[in-house]
A protein has these predicted regions:
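N-terminal capping/linker segments that flank leucine-rich repeat
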Residues: 1-67, 72, 180-200
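Tandem repeat scaffolds
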Residues: 56-200
Length: 200
């Protein structure tokens, strides 16, 4: 990766260039082969080098696209993942307790059984994400986009859902403190509520 960055000027290459494709292939290969501790080192490097940032204004692809990466079971508790592009990344059973994911893009990500207690996902994109049975207690989802997200069996006690877009989301079997949590959501259109009532 260092050679691609320094000698091949990876940052200046087009998204469909050979250099970008090689960087992505090498990264996905590393995530398949390495243990979780080393996967965390790779992710930290990519983050610090600003190779996986998501630009909410331009919607440009990051320099290294992580879609399809396997980060299952990783310990990312307390990590600063603000604004990262984690679209379609497998994050099943990941520990994201108290992590910062403000404005991160997690569209189509798989977060089944993930620990997100106390995490800040304000403004995050979670459209079509699978958060089934995730622990979202005391999580901030203020202004988060959760269109068609799966929250089946998720623990949403003390979760901040203010101005969150929950249109067409599935909250079947989810646990809430009270119904007032949902009153401040931006949209509940066609949302499947915890008692399986569809809000239209």
């Amino acid at each position: 990766m260092s050679k691609l960055l320094l000698e091949k000027r990876l940052r200046e290459k087009d998204p469909d260039s050979d250099e970008r494709l090689i960087a992505r292939a090498n990264t996905l290969r590393a995530f398949r082969k390495l243990d979780n501790k080393r996967k965390r080192y790779v992710l930290d490097f990519l983050n610090e080098a600003e190779l996986i940032a998501y630009d909410t204004k331009s919607d440009d692809q990051p320099i290294v696209l992580l879609s399809g990466a396997n980060l299952e079971g990783l310990d990312l508790s307390g990590a600063d993942l603000t604004g990262l592009d984690l679209r379609a990344v497998s994050l099943t059973q990941v520990n994201l307790k108290d992590a910062l994911l403000v404005d991160a893009n997690l569209d189509h990500a798989v977060l089944r059984n993930a620990d997100l207690k106390g995490a800040n996902l304000s403004g995050a994109f979670l459209n079509f994400a699978d958060l089934s049975y995730a622990d979202l207690r005391s999580t901030k989802l203020h202004k988060a986009e959760l269109f068609t997200a799966k929250l089946v069996g998720a623990d949403l006690r003390k979760t901040d859902l203010s101005e969150a877009d929950l249109a067409s989301a599935d909250l079947s079997g989810a646990t809430l403190d009270h119904w007032d949590q949902l009153k401040s959501a931006a949209s509940l259109e066609n949302t499947v509520l915890p008692n399986n009532i569809i809000r239209d």
